[in-house]
């Protein structure tokens, strides 16, 4: 936090005046002409000297052009009464071990991206700017068609996760402006939005430029030296693989942010983790951002009371370009099952699957929601299905089980059905038959567990959470703090904090850890 910028009249400069005496009456007028002039000169000199103590020299801000020093706080919160850094509580308060320090990055790394949102594209949409409003939640949904609650539903873009998380962090109750108290350091770089500007038609030098500039800035900050960056973390609304380009071939996808030597010391939270141990998955943002516990409870009760018309549902489009995709088989079986399966066709030109009214209308009427991998392992749809109380059915462990360890139960059979498909050529699953086999008692238990998970996978209003409730943000912060503490404990014991920190673990995406057959009873 920058020191207060005092005006000349506000600066706490104290001048003590004395009484001058003279025995020369003839010089009296001259003396009293000189004395005021002397004091005026002293005052001016003191002002210039003292003002140096109050120059805008934020210890977290490296010497950079003035344009990058623009304060970002007002860009991320609409609450004029909010104090970015509350008074640090006493060391024995509930914030002990939970303090987080937020770097005030140069403006080009976050706020400037929002100011120039028209330069960012989703690939399927020309204008991402409307999604920035309302803390990054996007426009309020007004035509809820008696499907959604009358409030707290928004048209949310998954790429806005970094903006949503930043707004939530600004309102985190255990912020500190004293980095020596902090257990973790948050780096509010909008990595996904930055890279989205350069994914198509730009060379790797341009794609990697912001990553290099960020790391150059971070490593000279005093906070970096404490743990060589291993207590630092950032968040992205893109999958972690987008930041792990493994070659310098111009045709390769993404940036090399996570392969830069300094960046390997940091952790990244994103909608999908990679094979590296310092990448962690947190939920995709859904379109429900409740303002209170009462709203969550109301929604949960609505989902419990639903009479579900369809046995299973699939919302998506075929992926014929991916030879290993199971989607074609799933769509075929859904069409064969007629009234027992509902197909929400999300192919271009069909139903708008970004509209939560369309998605929730189907999911809330289905017992099971099929969740095959999409363009990558994970799908936002799985969190929409949880939100609707629809039991997710997974075909690959990388879609959920290897991902959201802080948010979903370790016992994956308690909330989902697993039908592993290692090779689509060997597809021998009859989805309808497998789902019908599950006893009604177990279906009820599964649905109840899914509904119980709803508070853990939503990003609530930034003011929400002060009552001790844990939403997706709170659980992500808790998980990150625990991981950093593990590294810190290693260092206390004289061990190398880098040992295993950024190792690669491809095993977690294989079927082997999850090969035990599920008990359907």
Swiss-Prot record:
Residues 1-30 are cytoplasmic. Its main location: Golgi. It comes from the Eukaryota. The chain crosses the membrane at residues 31-51. InterPro entries: Exostosin, Exostosin_GT47. The lineage of its organism: Eukaryota, Viridiplantae, Streptophyta, Embryophyta, Tracheophyta. Expressed in roots, hypocotyls, cotyledons, leaves, stems, stamens and carpels. Its EC number is 2.4.1.-. Keywords: Glycoprotein, Glycosyltransferase, Golgi apparatus, Membrane, Signal-anchor, Transferase, Transmembrane, Transmembrane helix. Residues 76-87 have a biased composition (Basic and acidic residues). It holds the Pfam family Exostosin_GT47. Residues 72-92, 492-521 are annotated as: Disordered. Glycans are attached at residues 81, 177, 203, 249, 265, 411. It is found in: Golgi apparatus membrane. Residues 52-521 are lumenal. This is Probable xyloglucan galactosyltransferase GT14. Functions in xyloglucan synthesis by adding side chains to the xylosylated glucan backbone. Involved in the galactosylation of hemicellulose xyloglucan. PANTHER family: EXOSTOSIN HEPARAN SULFATE GLYCOSYLTRANSFERASE -RELATED (PTHR11062), XYLOGLUCAN GALACTOSYLTRANSFERASE GT14-RELATED (PTHR11062:SF241). Belongs to the glycosyltransferase 47 family. GO terms for biological process: protein glycosylation.
